[in-house]
Amino acid sequence: MKTGLFILIAGIFCVLLNDSLLFLQIRRYFKRKICSYLFWLHSLFFVACIVWYHLFIPTLKGPEAYFWVEKCISIILLFYTPKTLYIIVNAFSILLRMAKCIPAARIVNRLALGIALASFIVILNGITWYRYSYKIERETVCIKTLPDAFNDFRIVQLTDLHLGSYGEHYPGITKLVDEVNRLNPDLIVFTGDMVNSFA
């Protein structure tokens, strides 16, 4: 079996298993059938995303294509990491409910919801605002043997840009250039992870 096909089958299996376990845990909250239909419709959407990802990978030609594939993976992680955490933690709530420890079961259930929500917010922040925020760290290096001509010599080091993550029309690149120019460097060096899978 080819690796790509294995990943496709494993991905679909994980999505359906995850959603099936989640549905068993929360179906008592669904008062109408439409809620169940919407739940499985959203599950089928992610199955379609995995199939699209599998078909799209061989056609990758440049960073823009890679950008959208990365977005697809990020969206899947955004939803299924919180779901998985909720399923695991809420399993203890179910066990407590079976043991007739209803107050403790409710506390654990709320804890599961809190953990799932927190992970959703953290991942959302990571794939949207935080990943594109530039951080400036200033260091002063004193070298006594350096000629006087190099006093106040400024070096700007750019690292871990991962340009393939931005997409073709990302305006933050202009912001980055302006920020570097504002620092008024004498020398600019590029180190480490300038690109992703594509140059």
For each predicted feature, which ranges?
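Membrane-embedded segments
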Residues: 132-137, 142, 146-199
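Non-catalytic terminal accessory segments
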Residues: 1-132
